[in-house]
Every structure is written in C-alpha cells, then in structure tokens.
Amino acid sequence: MRGFTIIQNILTAIVIPFLALIIGLCSFSGIYIFFKIIGLFGISIDSFNEVDSVPLEDFVITGVALGMGITAWGVTLVIFSGLLGGLFRPRLEPGRYPLKSFVTIQWAWSMIFHKIALFFLPFLVPSFIGNTFYRLSGAKLGKGVQINSAHLNDAGSVTLGDGVVIGGKAIINAHLTEKGELVMAPVNIGKDALIGMGSVIQPGCVIGEGAIVASRAVVPKWT
C-alpha cells in the first residue's frame, strides 16, 4: 500500500495521546481510594508542606493509601483494556496478509489495548483477574485454566481447554510477520495440556489433550 509509512507515523502520533487518555481515565479509582483512606484518618495533604513535622504514622498511612490506590488503578486499567480489546478485536480469517495494508493497521490497533494492560497485567497473573482480562479480550478459556503469563497475544484467536496450564513468561502468538506478510491463524490448546515456562507457541498450532510443551521450547506455526 503506497504511503503506508506516512499513515503509520500519523496513527502513531494519534495513538500516544490516546494511551495517555485511557491511563488517566482508569486512575479515577486509585485517586478516590487514596483520598478516601487518608480522609478516614484525618490526614491533610497540606500538612506535608512542613514535612519534618508530620508524624511517622501519617507517613505510614499515606504510603498504604498510595499502594492501595496504585493497585486499584492497575486493576481498573487491566479490566478496561480487556473490554476495549474485546470490542475492537479484528475478525480476520486465517491466512497471509500484506504487511503494508489496512489489515495490519486493524490488527495493530487491537494490540494497543494489550500493551496498555501490560502496565499491570504481569502482577495479576496467575489470578482470576488475569483470566478475566483474557476472556474480555476474546479468549476462550475452559474451566480451571491457569495462566501465568502476560503474553497471550491475539487473545481473540486463542482457545484453551479445561485444566490447561500456561507457564511463566510463555508466549502464545496467533500472528507472525515474515517476508512482508502478516500471518494470522488461531491457536488451540487441548484439555489438561501444559505449556512450559518461557516457551513460544506460534500461529496455527494445535496442542493435543494432555500434551506437555517443554520449557523454552518453540512450537513452529501450523504444527
């Protein structure tokens, strides 16, 4: 597509303030909790103008309030990013697409929300919050799935059967770029399969029930 680089640069310039907007909007919960906690203990922000005269317990309470606020912001950011990721996920047929095309732009736009979630998602896996993020993003997860990775990329094209365990820092990609093309294909992992720590699953892979993928192994596309 002619002029793709120019379009890419323009969209990048637009995306950066958009990211800032989402991050800022999701901070409302953290700000509320922070001021609510310090208010319950009668602490005034103005008192820190004379920091040397502030009682030690006020520092402790303020620190706890700050930690709770940051955590609330992070959880809100992850859930909201999951909602947007699911809403805007591309409905693309498996196949190869020119890298310099509107399909690539559509796919890249959907991945933005996962990148935003990565501010806090690594601290929330494995947990029901992490699983909720992936479900909201479009992943099909069976019962008892344990995901200890923040890198289930293209979640809308990933299916995990009951009891699947995804090891720490494993990467599951339903996309690949090669030779000027964007390769898209769903990934299906069968019931009770184990994906080892640090392994890489490429697009189009079908992992059978009860299969074990060794740590740091690479499963090539369409395996």
Annotate the PLM regions:
Residues 1-135:
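Terminal amphipathic alpha-helical/low-complexity segments used for targeting or macromolecular assembly
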Residues 133-136, 140-223:
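Structural signal for interior beta-strand "rungs" in well-ordered beta-sheet cores
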